[in-house]
Amino acid sequence: MSEWVEQRLQSLAKAFDQSYCGAIEAVVDLICQRFQAGNKLLICGNGGSAADAQHLAAEFVGRFHFNRQALPAIALTANSSILTSVSNDYTYDIVFSRQVEALGQPGDILWGLSTSGKSTNVLHALKCAKDKGLHTIGMAGNNGGLFQEFADYPLFVADKNTPCIQEVHLMTYHHICEQVESRLFAQKSVGIKV
C-alpha cells in the first residue's frame, strides 16, 4: 500500500510542474478580477467532471474555509430538466452551449472540464463562450486534447491516466477556491502556496 501511495504522490508532483502552477495563478487572477467586476462563473463537464463542476460551484457559492459573501458560480450540469429537454429536443452535443447562450454575458467565465479534452458538448460550450465574449478556462488531461483551440486559460495535465488527471484537477480547483476566497475577502490562506 505504501509503495502505491508513494508512486501516486510522485505522479501528482510531476503533474504540478512550473508552467502548470503558473497557469493556476493566472486563473486565480482572472476569477478574482471577474468576480470583482460583477461577472459570474459557469462550469461544465461530463461524468466525474460533471460532479467536479457541481463541487466547484458549491465551493464558490457556499464557502471554502470561512464564512463570507456568496460568489456567483453555476454548474451547468445540475439542472436535469434543461439537460434532458435539450438532449431530447436537439442533441446532447449542445446541452452546455445552449445554457451558455442563455446565461453567459461578455466578461463572464466558462470553465470546461474533461479528463480527455475531447468532450464534444464541452467543446461546443467553449466555442459558444468565446463567440459571446466570455473568458474560457479549459481543464483537461492529455495535454489539453481538442481544448487547446478554445481555452484562453489552459489547465492541461500532461498525463493520460484518468485517475491521476482527476486527482490533479481536484487539487487544482481546491487551491483556486482557497486563493480566490483569501484574496477577495482578505483572509489569511491556510493552504500551501504554489
Curated annotation (Swiss-Prot):
What cofactor is this protein dependent on? Zn(2+)
Coiled-coil spans in chain: none
Q: How is the cofactor bound?
A: Binds 1 zinc ion per subunit.
Question: Pathway it acts in?
Answer: Carbohydrate biosynthesis; D-glycero-D-manno-heptose 7-phosphate biosynthesis; D-glycero-alpha-D-manno-heptose 7-phosphate and D-glycero-beta-D-manno-heptose 7-phosphate from sedoheptulose 7-phosphate: step 1/1
For this protein, what reaction is catalysed? Answer: 2 D-sedoheptulose 7-phosphate = D-glycero-alpha-D-manno-heptose 7-phosphate + D-glycero-beta-D-manno-heptose 7-phosphate
Q: Which residues form the SIS domain?
A: 31-186
Family the UniProt entry places it in:
Belongs to the SIS family. GmhA subfamily.
Q: What is the documented function of this protein?
A: Catalyzes the isomerization of sedoheptulose 7-phosphate in D-glycero-D-manno-heptose 7-phosphate.
Q: What is this protein called?
A: Phosphoheptose isomerase
Originating species? Synechocystis sp. (strain ATCC 27184 / PCC 6803 / Kazusa)
| The encoding gene | gmhA
